[in-house]
UniProtKB/Swiss-Prot annotation:
Origin species: Latilactobacillus sakei subsp. sakei (strain 23K) (Lactobacillus sakei subsp. sakei)
Matching InterPro entries: Ribosomal_uL14 (IPR000218), Ribosomal_uL14_bac-type (IPR005745), Ribosomal_uL14_CS (IPR019972), Ribosomal_uL14_sf (IPR036853)
Lineage per the UniProt record: Bacteria, Bacillati, Bacillota, Bacilli, Lactobacillales
Gene name as annotated: rplN
Keyword presence, Magnesium: no
Top-rank taxon: Bacteria
Subunit structure: Part of the 50S ribosomal subunit. Forms a cluster with proteins L3 and L19. In the 70S ribosome, L14 and L19 interact and together make contacts with the 16S rRNA in bridges B5 and B8.
Protein name: Large ribosomal subunit protein uL14
Family that this chain belongs to: Belongs to the universal ribosomal protein uL14 family.
Length: 122
């Protein structure tokens, strides 16, 4: 579960390394986000020469969580870290590469571009 002030690793090559969650989008008063949810975040660490800079406010979609997600068949999927991919307003990733595995739940959330760029879909 990702909430306000949560820090996440960035799983793409947009230039950001770490982001801090500002708000969870989707409904009024929503407190937590899970895999496939969109958040508003600020960039806390960035690499020089990247597409995004430190201090920018961006939208991101969560691709991995430590707490995991329950699937329809009753199984759970958990990852070793919390990670997100920075996206544009039209749900396309700002980077051109995705690092690490992503969850299959992104397919249901209409993030097909991220799923196709990912090296592994679990």
């Amino acid at each position: 579960m990702i909430q306000s002030e949560s820090r996440l690793k960035v799983a793409d090559n947009s230039g950001a390394r770490e982001i801090l969650t500002i708000k969870v989008l989707g409904g009024s008063g929503r407190k937590t986000a899970n895999i496939g949810d969109v958040i508003v975040a600020t960039i806390k660490q960035a690499t020089p020469g990247g597409v995004v800079k430190k201090g920018e406010v961006v939208k991101a979609v969560i691709v991995r969580t430590k707490s995991g997600a329950r699937r329809v068949d009753g199984s759970y999927i958990k990852f070793d870290e919390n990670a997100a991919v920075i996206i544009n307003d039209d749900k396309t990733p700002k980077g051109t590469r995705i690092f690490g595995p992503v969850a299959r739940e992104l397919r249901d959330s209409d993030f097909m571009k991220i799923v196709s760029l990912a090296p592994e879909v679990l």
